[in-house]
Amino acid sequence: MQQDFAADDLDARADEAPTPAWAPPAPVRDPALLLERTLASHDRTSDLWVFGYASLIWRPEFPAAEQRLARVHGHHRALRMHSRINRGTPEQPGLVFALVRGGSCQGMVYRIERERAEAELRRLWRREMPSGVYDPKWLQCHTNQGPVSALAFTLSRHSPNYTGELDDDALVAILRHARGRFGSTLEYLLKTAVCLRDCGIRDLAIERQVALARRHGLAA
């Protein structure tokens, strides 16, 4: 997943933030339709598992009956999604993490009890899917207690929000300048790095990005 907390930058906490002076971007796809498809594909007699890879680890915002470290194969965490409200602006877009095809990703899976699953998923949708930019997928997540199928918010390389490859100069410029209503892209990167480290998760790409920020005097 991941927005910083949402697809192209809206959040369930929008009412707590200043009202923007311009209208938010139009949805890429119909979020309501995607939600109904996801609900229809979930066995409502079972608990709901959700995979978090960035802000859902350090700010899940839903009651989890259980959480486990987990690894997904076939997708990796990448700082390659534009953020034009939360961590940047339309004039100076920031970046947030997304789950992109290829490689693997270690994160956290959360179990939401079935009695609360639909209500919590609807809340989560308002946070992550207001513009329908993510591709919600059920992914096999491997944990020490066994595999679980969890909902993950992935990003297609064909998405208009996918940045593609960014060279170091472009990344440094974004880390130096991009700031949105929830703070800067740099703060988001550093917070994610600290959270993953505290969870015992190593991400070499993030470590490299943090080191790059330090070399340019952007982080201590």
Regions flagged by a language model, labelled:
Residues 1-220:
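A glycine-rich, hydrophobic/aromatic-adjacent loop/helix-cap motif
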